[in-house]
Amino acid sequence: MYIPQKQLETLTKILQPSKVIVVYGPRRCGKTTLLNEFLKGVNLRYLLVSGEDIVVQNYLSSQSIEKLLSFVGANQLLVIDEAQKINNIGMNLKLIVDHMKDVKIIATGSSSFDLAKNLGEPL
């Protein structure tokens, strides 16, 4: 799948610590491909996970700050594909951002309604 360079440049430009970038769109439109292509050029320690993975759901739906921080570890970038599958994802991403000021986060979702509902308040 072709990924326009402009999309990669935009992601690079807006990726900042203490912010969450949400990439959403219909299934099979290229969100995961965009992320994989983006990650090829990133010079950060990153963790790429899927919200469909039950272990990931267990960690990222937890409201334990200690559990969330241990999951992210020393990574500088957390990338969550299918984030809408994780309960309380919005509140928990906010906890990560509030307690790990240097971490950058990208979340994707195929259902903007479900993702928006689970994100709750703007981050």
Q: Predicted regions: what is each one?
A:
Residues 1-123:
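Phosphate-binding site recognition
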